[in-house]
Amino acid sequence: MKRILTFFIFMLLAMGPGAAGAQTVVMDEGHVAFDYPDSWLVVSPQLCGVYAPLLEDAGLDADELARELEQTRTLSRAYNENYTQYLSVMIGEDELSQEIYEIENATDNQRATLRRRVEANSFWETTGLRTQDAEWQKEDGGYWLYAHYTVTRAGETVGRGLRYITVRNGLYVEMDWRIASGRFSGRDLNAFRARLADLVVTEQIAEPVRDV
């Protein structure tokens, strides 16, 4: 059985995090939905307070986490059992994403510009992220910018992450996987790429007419 979550209706409030089946999270703000592992704890800015006791047991302050998710436009995040890794769905927006609007319409120059921003660490939503490599990949006919990055604090590496970035409805839609220690294996990379099939667009918004 699948659990369908929408962070505007809060269907999750009546259900524990360990219910059977996949956790399908519908995120209206980003016009997307994503299937999280069923055993992971899913939070959003609105749900951090609901799971405050569980988060505090893991050393996470619910209010601080809610602010972080809001500031980074993280629509949802799921933690594994021991909170050593998490998956997130994020959105962003700027002039370039509005110009592209849908990734299929992106020109070579626009894709090159976005890749340069990621490589130069100017795309990231917070400081301390350092791109290790980035490349465009094509999956199911759509372009995704893949990036591998490290998380640094005071010059020390405290985590690593993988991210896929595309453009839908004028928004950057991003799927992120971060681990607190260790390195990603080739098997991890393949598994993460396969997760792209679990991220779907739920609504297509007509592109606004722009003055020439």
Give the label of every model feature segment.
Residues 1-4:
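Positively charged n-region of N-terminal signal peptides that target proteins for export
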Residues 6-16:
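Bacterial N-terminal signal peptides
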Residues 29-50:
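Proline-anchored loop/turn motifs at beta-strand termini and strand-loop-strand connectors
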Residues 31, 35, 109, 113, ...:
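Extracytoplasmic/secreted proteins, especially bacterial periplasmic and envelope-associated proteins
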Residues 32, 79-81, 102, 106, ...:
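Extracytoplasmic/periplasmic, Sec-exported soluble proteins
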Residues 40, 169-212:
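Surface-exposed amphipathic alpha-helical segments
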Residues 46-168, 173-174:
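Conserved polar/disulfide-associated segments of primarily extracytoplasmic proteins
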